């Protein structure tokens, strides 16, 4: 589960971080794929990827792609279904109700932690929508 995710659109030639979250839920679940394979040194390597889709109209000004966000009624089937079922769910998943706001650039440094990283910047608005 995640509470949201970040995108960094370029606005007036400057990358500006935005936090994106569900409008109607404190958590979301992304569709993802994983595999475990030999690492070539006698061990195993576990890898994963978050599935993306074309951005919905709300997020399109921020980025042209977005994670596949699964509604709660699809969680169990995604985790326990077949690859064919996952593909069908990816195409059938509804567009989620999302909100976003610009956040401080401190989010770009992995040493920074805390709730302040998802807080709106003091101006309270995004340059995408003055």
Task: Explain the meaning of each model-derived region.
Residues 1-130:
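Short linear sequence motif anchored by a di-proline
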């Amino acid at each position: 589960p995640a509470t949201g995710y970040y995108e960094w659109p370029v606005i007036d030639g400057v990358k500006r971080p935005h936090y994106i979250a569900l409008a109607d839920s404190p958590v979301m679940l992304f569709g993802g794929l994983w595999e475990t394979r030999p690492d070539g040194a006698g061990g195993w390597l576990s890898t994963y990827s978050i599935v993306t889709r074309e951005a919905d109209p709300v997020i399109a000004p921020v980025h042209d792609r977005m994670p596949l966000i699964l509604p709660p009624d699809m969680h169990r089937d995604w985790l326990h279904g077949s690859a064919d079922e996952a593909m069908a769910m990816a195409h059938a998943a509804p567009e989620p109700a999302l909100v976003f706001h610009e956040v401080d650039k401190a989010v770009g440094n992995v040493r920074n932690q805390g709730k302040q990283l998802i807080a709106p910047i003091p101006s309270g608005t995004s340059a995408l929508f003055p």
